[in-house]
């Protein structure tokens, strides 16, 4: 598995002219995402089957998908700061705290239970366009031209992508 991940990193670099990427390998989408986030910007982390909780439990609860500022605050109020703290909570406690769907999801994620399928290709829900400048732009007229260009690109691209 590690060799495959190394090959993927090499292919990314070759296809992009040397751009690096972090690769995470795990037994689920959750663990692959966590693994890739552990060693940025140019890392490779493999979480072997059976090692999920060892990696997951020390992390802050905010590393889990679905734990934004509001949920994190509610969890902190009941002493939950790490994923291990979350895993120590009962399902009824989490349902009472976060609601049936969200509480059940948090309960599962804290135990590295994630059966979401990996979908290689999916329908785009958004488009993006960005420009990086060598230095900060302070002239509003120059900035306005770039904004106009970006808006035009978006206006022309949306119908072709069938997003709207």
Range-by-range predicted roles:
Residues 71, 76-158:
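DNA-contacting surface of Y-family translesion DNA polymerases
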Residues 160-164:
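Single conserved hydrophobic/aromatic residue that forms the stacking wall/gate
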Residues 1-105, 118:
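Gly/Gly-Pro- and Ser/Thr-rich, intrinsically disordered tail segments characteristic of DNA damage-repair
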């Amino acid at each position: 598995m590690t060799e495959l991940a190394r090959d993927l990193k090499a292919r990314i670099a070759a296809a992009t002219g040397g751009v690096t990427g972090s690769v995470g390998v795990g037994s689920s989408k959750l663990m692959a995402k966590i693994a890739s986030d552990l060693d940025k910007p140019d890392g490779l982390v493999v979480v072997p089957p059976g090692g999920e909780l060892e990696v997951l439990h020390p992390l802050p609860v905010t590393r889990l998908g679905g734990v934004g500022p509001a949920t994190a605050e509610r969890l902190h109020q009941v002493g939950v700061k790490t994923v291990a703290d979350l895993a120590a909570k009962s399902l009824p406690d989490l349902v009472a705290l976060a609601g049936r769907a969200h509480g059940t999801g948090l309960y599962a994620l804290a135990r590295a239970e994630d059966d979401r399928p990996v979908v290689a290709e999916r329908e785009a829900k958004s488009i993006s366009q960005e420009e990086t400048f060598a230095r900060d732009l302070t002239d509003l007229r120059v900035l306005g031209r770039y904004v106009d260009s970006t808006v035009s690109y978006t206006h022309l691209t949306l119908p072709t992508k069938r997003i709207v």
